[in-house]
Regions:
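Sec/Tat signal peptide C-region and signal peptidase I cleavage site
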Residues: 19, 32-38
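Sec-dependent N-terminal signal peptides
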Residues: 23-32
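Ligand-binding "clamshell"
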Residues: 67, 121-135, 179
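Residues embedded in well-ordered beta-strands
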Residues: 52, 138-140
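Ligand-binding cleft/hinge of the Venus flytrap
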Residues: 63-69, 80-89, 151-156, 169-180
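Flexible hinge/capping segments at coil-to-helix
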Residues: 143-160
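Positively charged n-region of N-terminal signal peptides that target proteins for export
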Residues: 17-23
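Extracytoplasmic small-molecule ligand-binding "clamshell" domains
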Residues: 40-116, 124
Length: 180
């Protein structure tokens, strides 16, 4: 990587992190439907001095748990550390699973989570900020099978096994697009 590429990457990364911190701080204040409750949630975080963040630790490069150190690392982890620093509190990463990521918020197991896909079902019970990272989901097949599986419809076959992570929005989409 050239110096210019490194600078551009760091500049973009810092701008994105700053934008995300603002969005997430706003989410902490407005996470619950009633502003008084949301404000008390923020007050609770500030008075306890701890921001509890639910994270799965299984989605590189956003959140990964390093088995050597047993600590989390990744883009979302960096942003949450910066957000906590800006708030003047410590951050505590709480292990979470995709299938229960939203219930961890609604049960107050943690205060916030990141990189959670907004779905209508999740939006019924949880608040979401604006998107800070967009990605697409596409089927992945072995290169030698590209001709055999050249369309999405060619994958919708009872003899084809589709694998996803349980509890994710990708699981929902796989069931929708590949019902066979």
């Amino acid at each position: 990587m050239t110096l210019r590429q490194d600078y551009s990457h760091n500049l973009f990364s810092n701008q994105l992190k700053n934008r995300m911190k603002k969005l997430l701080l706003a989410a902490l204040v407005a996470f619950l439907p009633f502003s008084a409750i949301a404000e008390s949630n923020l007050d609770k975080i500030l008075s306890a001095g701890i921001l509890k963040v639910g994270t799965t630790g299984d989605w590189d490069p956003m959140t990964m748990k390093d088995p050597a150190t047993n600590k989390y690392k990744g883009f979302d982890i960096d942003v949450m550390n910066e957000l906590a620093k800006d708030m003047g509190v410590k951050v505590e990463f709480v292990p979470a699973e995709w299938k229960t990521i939203v219930s961890g918020i609604t049960s107050a197991r943690y205060d916030i989570s990141t990189s959670v896909t907004k779905t209508p079902k999740r939006a019924e019970v949880a608040g979401f900020t604006d998107t800070y990272y967009k990605y697409g989901t596409v089927p992945l097949v072995l290169k030698k099978n590209l001709k055999k599986f050249s369309t999405w419809n060619s994958l919708n076959n009872s003899k084809v096994t589709i694998a996803t992570t349980l509890g994710t929005s990708q699981e929902e989409k796989a069931k929708e697009f590949f019902p066979k």
